UniProtKB/Swiss-Prot annotation:
Organism: Sulfolobus filamentous virus 1 (SFV1)
Protein name: Major capsid protein VP5
DNA-binding listed as a keyword: yes
Keywords recorded for this protein, A-Z: DNA-binding, Virion
Its biological purpose: Self-assembles to form a helical, filamentous nucleocapsid. Together with capsid protein 1, wraps arounds the DNA and maintains it in an A-form. Capsid proteins probably maintain the DNA in A-form by non-specific desolvation and specific coordination of the DNA phosphate groups by positively charged residues. This certainly protects the viral DNA under conditions such as the extreme desiccation of its host.
Length: 199
């Protein structure tokens, strides 16, 4: 006598269940895709806004440092390397956003500074030591450390870290600052403006 096939082992039923699961998985993936795209767009907008605010704040910090005498004496030749400084400090934003530790941030920013200053100081009246002194003075104002030392060798401006460099604090019109991770996790521009991190 043939053994009766149970519904649990019925190949047709098993196949239909499998197809149903595939369809459900596809629907779930499509649904989650909406959230993934929305999160990507929101994250991109937040990062773009933070970069713009960061660059504006950086420009203000550099200008204030220059006016207060924390930079080389000759204002015109400091302006000659302003774009190079912007590139170095923007790399600080990049490495902060990668959630690196303070030591790794210092090492990576020092590498960017070495390449950028070696390329951009040629033909200016700014020495390697003066440029790094200016960078340190800005970091001292911003995060309370002077992380780099400089050595000019065979035309290259070698920048090496001497202390850890904390992640970027983002300024806000409220007068507070916050780590970039907190800023990017905010759900709206209002939260970014109002977020309270460090003083």
């Amino acid at each position: 006598m043939a053994r009766k096939r149970t519904s649990k082992n019925d190949p047709l039923r098993m196949y239909l269940n499998y197809v149903r699961k595939l369809q459900t998985m596809g629907d779930a993936y499509d649904e989650s895709a909406k959230y993934r795209i929305a999160n990507f767009e929101n994250g991109f907008k937040s990062l773009h806004m933070v970069e713009n605010e960061f660059k504006q704040y950086l420009a203000n910090v550099i200008d204030e440092a220059i006016k207060s005498g924390a930079s080389p004496q000759d204002l015109p030749y400091v302006n000659e390397i302003k774009l190079a400084l912007m590139k170095i400090f923007t790399s600080w934003l990049k490495y902060s956003n990668e959630k690196l530790g303070a030591n790794e941030i210092a090492i990576n920013v020092a590498g960017t500074a070495t390449m950028t200053l070696t390329e951009n100081l040629y033909g200016t009246r700014v020495s390697c030591e003066e440029a790094v002194s200016l960078i340190n003075s800005i970091f001292a104002v911003w995060v309370g450390v002077e992380p780099f030392e400089a050595e000019e060798r065979e035309g290259a401006c070698l920048v090496t870290p001497r202390s850890p460099l904390p992640p970027v604090p983002i300024s806000s019109p409220t007068g507070f600052s916050a780590p970039i991770q907190e800023v990017l996790q905010a759900k709206s521009p209002e939260e970014i403006i109002g977020v309270k991190g460090g003083a």
